[in-house]
């Protein structure tokens, strides 16, 4: 007799960055602890783009064509110090970083960390304690450069894997695999307007992604249409999340003083979309710290492949080829 599959509960949380990075990490921890006690409890939570470290909306850093200001450089100092150090190398150590094979890396709690600032270990601890697979956007510093990044934190064995964007390595587009409640999930992320890059999207579809993550800072009404298109193209579940906050929540260094304005700087707009493009939850507007949760059946991805598989039967790979430097885009095992 066929059994009904147990639903996988997916969630997006549009929390906003707080005044300091330790405060933001603590807020993430509290949100996950609270969610773990919920009914239903999410199996996976996605937090927004640059949630840890902050998205510097409205900041010009004193820059115009041909000129920089001392005040702008001071802004950058503040922003740089809010970024986190995950212990990777500037060129990206890949699997060596994941497996803790770099000099100074070791298993253990934050007090024994000799590489990085302990953020990786804090996130792994939260995942272990709550049993929730955590995916969050963050701003990472490596050497003298900042990167907009996504980190995946699996609750099993404290493992984590990180995806760097911007000037990161093309090999970091590799999808991540995990099992939740016995269900095989292949997940990958594209940050903000990277989702407008058709070849990048196709590199993820080619890896047979069934959970597509899109942390963003785009609050335009057109964003939902893009997320529905991605879900239909990839025949995958799509989670998109954006921060929601008012001007008074922005850091003082951004404008020189703390604003008292109650106007929204970012209205959110987080959503969850099915493999056939149906909006399951959202978009969630003007709800600071709001969270959406929905139970899904990943067999819906297979049901969608009956008539469309853009990286398979529809791809015409006899005529078109996509190669990504340093990346194997075949589905991960």
Language-model features: locations:
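N-terminal glycine-/serine-/threonine-rich phosphate-binding loop
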Residues: 2-44
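A generic structural motif
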Residues: 16, 59, 157, 245, ...
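Active-site beta-strand/loop signature of hydrolases that rely on acidic residues for catalysis
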Residues: 35-63, 68, 75, 86, ...
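Eukaryotic helix-linker segments that join adjacent hydrophobic helices
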Residues: 61-116, 120-127
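Active-site catalytic loop in hydrolytic enzyme cores
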Residues: 69, 112-210, 215-229
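CN hydrolase (nitrilase-like) catalytic-core segments centered on the catalytic cysteine
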Residues: 121-134, 195-292
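A short, polar/charged loop-to-alpha-helix boundary motif
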Residues: 155-169, 288-308
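A conserved C-terminal secondary-structure "cap"
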Residues: 299-333
């Amino acid at each position: 007799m066929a059994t009904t599959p147990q639903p996988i509960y997916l969630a997006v949380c549009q929390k906003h960055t707080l005044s300091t990075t330790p405060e933001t990490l603590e807020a993430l921890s509290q949100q996950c602890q609270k969610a773990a006690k919920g009914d239903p409890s999410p199996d996976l939570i996605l937090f927004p783009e640059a949630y840890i470290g902050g998205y510097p909306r409205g900041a010009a850093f004193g820059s115009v064509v041909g000129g920089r200001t001392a005040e702008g450089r001071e802004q950058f100092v503040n922003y740089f110090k809010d970024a986190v150090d995950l212990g990777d190398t500037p060129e990206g150590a890949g699997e060596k970083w994941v497996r803790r094979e770099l000099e100074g890396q070791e298993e253990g709690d934050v007090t024994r960390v000799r590489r990085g600032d302990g953020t990786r270990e804090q996130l792994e601890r939260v995942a272990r304690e709550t049993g929730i697979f955590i995916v969050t956007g963050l701003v990472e510093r490596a050497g003298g450069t900042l990167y907009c990044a996504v980190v995946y934190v699996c609750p099993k064995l404290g493992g984590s894997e990180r995806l760097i964007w911007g000037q990161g390595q093309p090999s970091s587009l590799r999808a991540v695999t995990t099992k939740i409640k016995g269900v095989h999930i292949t997940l990958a992320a594209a940050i903000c307007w990277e989702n407008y890059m058709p070849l990048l999207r196709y590199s993820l579809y080619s890896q047979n992604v069934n959970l597509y993550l899109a942390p963003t800072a785009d609050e335009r009404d057109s964003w939902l249409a893009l997320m529905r298109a991605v879900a239909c193209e990839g025949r995958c579940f799509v989670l998109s999340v954006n921060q929601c906050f008012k001007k008074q929540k922005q850091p003082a260094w951004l404008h020189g003083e703390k604003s008292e304005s109650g106007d929204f700087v970012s209205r959110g707009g987080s959503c969850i979309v099915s493999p056939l493009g149906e909006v399951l939850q959202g978009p969630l507007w003007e709800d600071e710290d709001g969270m959406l949760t929905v139970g899904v059946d990943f067999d819906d991805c297979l049901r969608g492949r009956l008539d469309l598989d853009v990286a398979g039967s529809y791809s015409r790979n006899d005529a078109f080829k996509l190669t990504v430097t340093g990346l194997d885009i075949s589905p991960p095992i």
